Regions:
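Extended Gly/Ser/Thr-rich low-complexity repeat segments
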Residues: 91-99, 118-123, 157-164
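Mid-length scaffold segments of soluble, non-membrane domains
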Residues: 97-141
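Sec-dependent bacterial lipoprotein signal peptides
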Residues: 1-18
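An ectodomain-focused feature that recognizes extracytoplasmic/extracellular
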Residues: 38-113
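Internal interaction segment
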Residues: 21-22, 126, 131-197
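Bacterial lipoprotein signal-peptidase II cleavage site
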Residues: 20-28
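Phosphate/adenylate-binding glycine loop and adjacent helical scaffold
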Residues: 27-37
């Protein structure tokens, strides 16, 4: 399944930017937040542990699913795992990594410029991560935001096991569940292995 070159370019650019030297004042990923929902524009500056999941797993959406693409045209191979409608530009969320890099970058398009953190939730709990890069999103408007997540993070481990993930970035809130009969769970598992093994 192919996604818009614009989306892929943004994901690749964010991945390359994130791989460069971090600013001296950069916060560590996976910073802690209290269990209460964060303000849409609130930044998170203190490390936090996952909070208990308060809501049930979401149901799969008919048109959407998780699709993976490997880019082996560069010196180091990378992979994108996108939640999207195939053959369209409708891709509200993606994960990307370099092979064996043990760090994963989550990308959210069309976000409010004031958003400074992204919250992820899976069957293992939830965490809030500070925004690492923010770029103009010409396709969706607003900003294309990325956060960096350790490859072995417990929220991602829960996603790998259950096949669902929720993302909150200001007013943006997506509940994203894999279709078990389309091969998406296997794609998710393959992505996580690609990033961490």
């Amino acid at each position: 399944m192919s996604a818009s070159p614009h989306i892929i370019a943004l994901a690749a650019a964010a991945l390359l930017a994130a791989c460069g030297p971090a600013p001296a004042s950069s916060d560590a990923p996976g910073e802690a937040t209290p269990p209460a929902p964060e303000s849409p524009a609130a930044a998170t500056d203190a490390p936090a542990t996952p909070t208990a999941v308060q809501t049930a797993a979401p149901a799969p959406q008919a048109a959407y699913d998780w699709y993976g693409r490997i880019n082996d045209e560069e010196r180091s191979r990378s992979m994108v795992l996108a939640y999207e409608v195939p053959e369209t530009d409708d891709q509200p969320f993606n994960l990307s990594c370099e092979e064996g890099g043990e760090r994963i970058f989550a990308g959210v398009p069309g976000a409010d410029p004031a958003v400074q953190s992204i919250r992820l939730e899976s069957s293992a709990g939830s965490k809030t991560f500070p925004v690492k890069t923010s770029e103009a999103d010409e396709l969706n408007g607003g900003r294309y935001l990325t956060v960096e997540i350790p490859g072995g993070d417990s929220v991602l481990a829960g996603f790998r096991q259950s096949g669902w993930l929720r993302v909150t970035a200001g007013a943006i809130n997506h509940a994203m569940a894999a279709h078990g009969d389309r091969g998406a769970p296997q794609t998710i598992n393959r992505f996580m292995a690609f990033c961490n093994d």
